[in-house]
Amino acid sequence: MAKYDEKKQLKCSFCGKTQDQVKRLIAGPGVYICDECIDLCSEIIADEFEETVEFDTKSVPKPNEIKQYLDSYVIGQERAKKSLSVAVYNHYKRINTNKQDTDVELSKSNILLLGPTGSGKTLLAQTLAKVLNVPFAIADATTLTEAGYVGEDVENILLKLIQNADYDVERAERGIIYIDEIDKIARKSENPSITRDVSGEGVQQALLKILEGTVASVPPQGGRKHPHQEFIQINTSNILFICGGAFDGVDKIIENRTRKSSMGFGAEIQGKHEKDIGKLLKEIMPGDLLKFGLIPEFVGRLPILVTLESLDKDALINILTKPKNALVKQYKKLFELDDVELEFNNEALTSIAEEAIERKTGARGLRAIIEEMMTEIMYEIPSDEQITKVIITEECIKDKENPQVERLPEGKTRGTLASNRVKKDIESA
């Protein structure tokens, strides 16, 4: 019940203070609560919530466990998976250590992934977030521009993470952000220019603070900031940033450097194409990234360099068939939902892999190749009840021939077979 003094003045039902003694008194059905009691309740709830979201190092998977999980989804790239597993484990171990009173404060180590298109950079980052059960966001560096110009502010990257954490800022502050196409924001030339580079060096400068760790003000609805809107405050000190890019042309920079260092009497002479790009990338140094167009401060905030190799034919065939979410398994499941069996023969898988290599799209292009070839048969199956099996052959890929089809005799359909199976199951039960 609402409490009244002799002058019928309203009082807080919890602390007993009158409306004159507090800034605000909020009414409910038969009760009142003051702003001071609301603040106290908020503090109690916040303290309890903080205990529930406390990130315990013991719960972080060990590097070998992280790699085993990555192996289930990512084929090949053994060296990259080991490097990422160690880096991610150390990052979350650092979060806990810095909460304790220690003499040494561990600094953050963000990651730079370098590898050809379709080598698995994005998939690696996504899978890491999945195994750690932390919020994850992907951003495209090519959409970012310096503040004040048409395009996205860098703070919009953080908004995506907050949204994926269901606006739970505490969880978002322990999340992972993957910035793709980071090589596209390299400045246009090695020498500083007097003209404004709003999508290159300007974006690198804008990213520096959030990469290192700062309390950023994020507009909750996205878009540009304006002075009359409220902001979400988020501390980026414990957010792990993984930046990825193909860095086309950096192999020539590495090759020039290594060739100069191996010049001289008795030096081993190698042909220009003797080393593939994947092997050259393993020899990358921070100085090569500076020559490519990244500024020194930006390179300094990405101390862990992880390189990925181009995927060969065998790796692409394994990607088609072995992971938990392999494309062949996905399409077989789609056909199974229509009571149709799908089969890829070995020659067909080889042809799909060869086509992806020819298109230079890596693993990313595998789905497009299969989809092009399967569209017609997937269009026909739902309305053709006599088809029971579809076989994909080498000719389907190379010569664009239709898949081989097995059909039921006239008068029989998949629907009648399914109903007969149900009847038998009922009778046997």
Curated annotation (Swiss-Prot):
Q: Locate the ClpX-type ZB domain: which residues?
A: 1-53
**Nucleotide-binding found in the keyword field:** yes
Composition bias of kind Basic and acidic residues appears in 402-413
**According to the UniProt record, where is the region Disordered?**
402-429
Positions with a binding annotation for Zn(2+): C12, C15, C34, C37
Stated role: ATP-dependent specificity component of the Clp protease. It directs the protease to specific substrates. Can perform chaperone functions in the absence of ClpP.
Which family does the entry's similarity section mention? Answer: Belongs to the ClpX chaperone family.
Q: Which NCBIfam families match?
A: clpX, PRK05342.1
How does this protein assemble?
Component of the ClpX-ClpP complex. Forms a hexameric ring that, in the presence of ATP, binds to fourteen ClpP subunits assembled into a disk-like structure with a central cavity, resembling the structure of eukaryotic proteasomes.
User: Mind telling me what this protein is named?
Assistant: ATP-dependent Clp protease ATP-binding subunit ClpX
- The protein's organism comes out as Clostridium botulinum (strain Alaska E43 / Type E3)
Gene it is expressed from: clpX
